[in-house]
Every structure is written in structure tokens, then in C-alpha cells.
Amino acid sequence: MRFNELQPAKGSRFAGKRLGRGIGSGLGKTSGKGHKGQKARSGGYHKVGFEGGQMPLQRRLPKRGFRSLKKLGTARIRLSELQKIDAEVIDLNALKAAGLASERAVAAKVYLNGTISKAVTLRGVSISAGAKAALEAAGGSVEE
């Protein structure tokens, strides 16, 4: 087989509709658009969500909630992920260096998920009550 002999698999490709090419094609004359009207014109169609002047659904329904910017800037860390870090003292910079927190994070919080057997010191990182108890049971400590 040569490059010039390559062909797509049977049925994988099909020709597009040829519009306005005679009455026998089934898509001649008006090209499947019917007679007159907005939708028959070139570029003639309503915008997405337009309901003919009726108040559209996305405007009838009430707004709800918001995206907390505090949440976007806070990295959420599992307790078990602290095992991967070699440092004795773990702060936000250590979490960023280990790839556990994004570079844009301005704060971090450790949650109880998994276990920890290594004694580490958390500095400047908030921690949930359950995770704090597990960390202190493993011999670690938390500094504010």
C-alpha cells in the first residue's frame, strides 16, 4: 500500500447536502428553506434564547448564589497528601513547591481525608478539627 492509495473507511465520511441544484435533488429552488419569512433569508434567525418577545426563560428565573472568591484562592489539601512532602515544617510555599497548591493560591486548608503517620509541623495553614486531632495523634503540631 502506498500513500496515494490511502482511503477513508467505508461509511466514515459522507458528502454534504448540495442545495439549490435542481428539482430532482429534493433540495432545489428554495433549498429546503420554504417560502419567504425570516428563516428563509440569509443570516436570518433569532438569537439563542429568544422567545418571540416573551420574557425568556433565563430572565424569568431568579438569580441565585455567587462564586466565592475566597474559595477560589484557597487550596484544599487532604491530610494523606502531607506524607508526600519531605519538609519538617509545611507552609503554603512548601505546598506550592510540592504541587499540592496552585501558584495562585493565597491560603490553604487541610481536611481529614486518609491517614498520616509522619510528624510534621503546619505553619500558616488552616486545618479542620478532625485533621488537627489526627495530625497531633501522629506526633505533629499546628502553628498559627
UniProtKB/Swiss-Prot annotation:
The gene is rplO. Binds to the 23S rRNA. Residues 21-31 have a biased composition (Gly residues). It comes from Dichelobacter nodosus (strain VCS1703A). GO terms for biological process: translation. Belongs to the universal ribosomal protein uL15 family. The lineage of its organism: Bacteria, Pseudomonadati, Pseudomonadota, Gammaproteobacteria, Cardiobacteriales. It comes from the Bacteria. Disulfide bonds: none annotated. This is Large ribosomal subunit protein uL15.
